[in-house]
Structure formats: structure tokens, C-alpha cells
A protein has these predicted regions:
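Short, well-structured N-terminal submotif of metal-dependent ribonuclease cores
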Residues: 1-44, 58-72, 114, 124, ...
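Active-site neighborhoods of divalent-metal-dependent phosphate/nucleic-acid chemistry enzymes
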Residues: 64, 75-121
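Phosphate/NTP-binding elements of NTP-utilizing enzymes
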Residues: 52
Length: 135
């Protein structure tokens, strides 16, 4: 059976999946479970790997395993979507009301370019209504 549901996951949700699922909404958890049950249903942007690595190297999160092992786990559990020129162009064109953080912009633009919904707790992203979100 082919992939029938693909959902883009924001960086903080990746961290919460690994360490603190109680932070996630019931709807987010249910959507993640559904996507996993239907095949390769969870995706991340390349930039999420950079963000997780940066958080770990700065001591903001404790991985409990080597960064390399954690990143291998991420790559095994998620479809990793590359940062494309189309996504960059889309991110640059976002209105000023969208979060300014370049990673947030790339993740949101990736969702739009790929036609995916984004699981995120980020209120600014959700309020923008620019990207289809699940929370």
C-alpha cells in the first residue's frame, strides 16, 4: 500500500515526540498516530535537523544519546524533505505578520510547496492562517 497521509512536523514537536509527548495536543497526537499507521506519514524539513543539533549543542535539550545517534533516529522515523529553491522563494515572500525566524519560514514554506499540513503549537504560525496547521 502506498503512502496515503504525509504530515510535516515542526521542530518542537519532534523534540516533544522524543521527550515529552504530554506537551502535545490530543489532536496532534491522534494525527501523528494516524499518519504512522498509514505508512511513512511524518515528514520534517532539513532545517529541523539543524535546529535539533543546535539545541543539543547549546545544552537546551539533553538527548541521552550522541547527537549522531539521535539524528540517525530522526532520519529513520521521518521523511526528510530538502530545503528547495521554491521553498526559499516562498519563505522570502511571506508577509511581515508571519514569524521572522528563518527556520519557521522555511518549515512553513515547505508545507505550502509540498501541499502538506503542519503540526505545530506555534501560535504565530497558526494565527497567520498562511499555512494549514494541526494542533
Amino acid at each position: 500500500m502506498g503512502q496515503t497521509l504525509l504530515i510535516l512536523v515542526d521542530t518542537h514537536v519532534v523534540v516533544w515526540l522524543a521527550f515529552d509527548q504530554k506537551q502535545m495536543s490530543k489532536k496532534a497526537r491522534a494525527t501523528i498516530d494516524e499518519a504512522r499507521n498509514l505508512g511513512d506519514g511524518l515528514a520534517i524539513s532539513d532545517i529541523t535537523i539543524l535546529e535539533v543539533g543546535t539545541l543539543a549543542s547549546r545544552g537546551r535539550i539533553q538527548l541521552g544519546i550522541s547527537l549522531e545517534s539521535f539524528l540517525q533516529e530522526i532520519e529513520a522515523r521521518f521523511v526528510v524533505l530538502p530545503i528547495t529553491g521554491r521553498a526559499c522563494a516562498r519563505a522570502i515572500g511571506f508577509p511581515a505578520s508571519y514569524p521572522k525566524d528563518p527556520a519557521d519560514r522555511i518549515i512553513g514554506a515547505t508545507a505550502l510547496v509540498e501541499g502538506l499540513s503542519l503540526i505545530t503549537a506555534d501560535r504565530e504560525i497558526r494565527r497567520s492562517r498562511l499555512v494549514p496547521t494541526i494542533w
